[in-house]
């Protein structure tokens, strides 16, 4: 009987563990931020960066994404509660075509790739040092559907009344 209980427990753990979602950007990565990589000292290092997409630019052989960096949750999803944090910006380029209609401004993205230098670009009139990422993985997070909040009004505090008294 104890063997049956143990076997049932093992099967339950395996079934429930199978429900866990593992994204292609999961794993352990060094805590290097785009702001730290602006100096160029982090070139060649494998990192996981993410944030809010500012712009996607398809080119002949690759698509480059300009991103406002945010801290990431453990699963790699950008932490939207920290939009005011100063993680900096970065440009991630990945081989192939990524449709700007799907990869639209405001979407959450996470990249895994190698730091590949610093690229100067203008933000308004300011020259900004964008760390450049050679992305091996591009992950577009699914949109979260938020249901509108509804409320129920109880008359008489929910007690009494109604058709039965």
Where are these regions (language model features)?
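Sec-dependent bacterial lipoprotein signal peptides
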Residues: 1-19
């Amino acid at each position: 009987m104890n063997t049956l209980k143990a076997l049932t427990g093992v099967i339950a753990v395996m079934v429930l563990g199978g429900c866990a979602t593992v994204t292609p950007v999961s794993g352990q990565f060094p805590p290097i931020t785009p702001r730290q990589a602006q100096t160029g000292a982090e070139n060649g290092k494998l990192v996981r960066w993410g944030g809010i997409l500012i712009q996607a630019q398809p080119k002949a052989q690759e698509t480059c994404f300009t991103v406002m960096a945010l801290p990431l949750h453990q699963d790699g999803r950008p932490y939207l509660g920290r939009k005011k944090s100063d993680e900096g910006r970065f440009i991630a380029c990945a081989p192939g075509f990524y449709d700007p209609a799907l990869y639209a401004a405001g979407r959450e993205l996470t990249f895994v790739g190698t730091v590949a230098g610093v690229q100067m670009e203008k933000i308004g009139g300011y020259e900004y040092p964008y760390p450049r990422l050679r992305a091996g993985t591009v992950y577009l997070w699914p949109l979260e559907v938020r249901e509108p909040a509804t409320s129920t009004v109880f008359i008489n505090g929910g007690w009494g009344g109604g058709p039965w008294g």
